[in-house]
Amino acid sequence: LRKLKSILLVDDDETTNFLNKFFIRQLDNDLTVNTVTNGEEAIEFLEAVPYKKHMPCLLILDTNMPIMNGWEFLDVYEKKFDKDFKKNVIIVMLTALDTEAVTAMAMSNPNVTDTAQKPLSDLKFRVLINKYFS
């Protein structure tokens, strides 16, 4: 397992981003936590970020957002980034509804590593981080 260096929160709800950032800070104060409010901003952020400095990265992706939603983000992400980049990004797709259909759709995408139901808690973050990172 690799050591987690950064988390990118992609959600149009500022309150959700604030709370998630708070939970993460309680777990590990050394982590770099960035927030963007839609998929388009996430793509721009990932293109601009100095690759090595922030990898590996945990990307928490909401499904429903304006401008570019989570599904559209995944389509652009697939085309824009190479395999070496993608192997260092763990994408967890957030679902507001715990439906098998949404989970199955997310998990059928090769770039999605896991799904989680909103809202996240400090316990859910701890489980996700421990599952994929040392």
Regions picked out by a protein language model, each given a short descriptive name:
Residues M65:
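Receiver (REC) domain active-site loop signature in two-component systems and cognate sites
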Residues L120-I129:
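C-terminal output helix
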Residues D12, V92-D98, P119:
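Conserved active-site segment of CheY-like receiver
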Residues E72, K87-V89, L97-T115, V127:
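Alpha4 helix (beta4-alpha4-beta5 surface) of REC/receiver domains from two-component response regulators
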Residues P50-I60, V89:
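Active-site beta3 strand of CheY-like receiver
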Residues E44, W71-F85:
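Short amphipathic alpha-helix used as the core "switch/output" element in two-component signaling
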Residues K5-T16, N20-I24:
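Conserved acidic segment of CheY-like receiver
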Residues T35-E44, A48, G70:
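Helix N-cap/capping motif at the beta->alpha junctions
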